[in-house]
């Protein structure tokens, strides 16, 4: 009986260690993306420039891994600095 209780305790203890050591899933959404700031306009995200000025400026000025453009209604465009992914888009 005592061996069974000790065994169960050991199993739970190992399970706890494994769960606490598992790395967290990389941040997504708002934790990764921060707006560059200001009205950057179309020039920051012009589709024919690769990588975009948004990508380059986020890396140089904000210390981010990259930058992404989000297009809204009409000419509304936002530059979001990406602190998790360095893939140019």
Curated annotation (Swiss-Prot):
Q: Name one GO molecular function term.
A: serine-type endopeptidase inhibitor activity
Q: List localization entries.
A: Secreted
What happens upon changing residue 6 to I?
In strain: cv. Goe-0
Return any one Pfam family short name: Toxin_3
- Keyword Lyase carried by entry: no
Query: Which region is the signal sequence?
Result: 1-27
Please give the start and end residues of each transmembrane region: none
Q: Is Nucleotide-binding among this UniProt entry's keywords?
A: no
Choose any GO biological process term that the UniProt entry carries and state it: defense response to fungus
Q: Which UniProt keywords apply?
A: Antimicrobial, Disulfide bond, Fungicide, Plant defense, Secreted, Signal
Q: Origin, by domain of life?
A: Eukaryota
Enumerate the InterPro entries for this protein.
Scorpion_toxin-like, Scorpion_toxin-like_sf, Scorpion_toxinL/defensin
Q: Which cysteines are joined by disulfide bonds?
A: 32-84, 45-69, 54-79, 58-81
Q: Got a GO cellular component term for this one? A: extracellular region
Main location class: secreted
Site entry (Reactive bond), positions? 48-49
Instruction: Provide the family line.
Output: Belongs to the DEFL family. Protease inhibitor I18 (RTI/MTI-2) subfamily.
Q: What is this protein called?
A: Defensin-like protein 195
Source organism? Arabidopsis thaliana
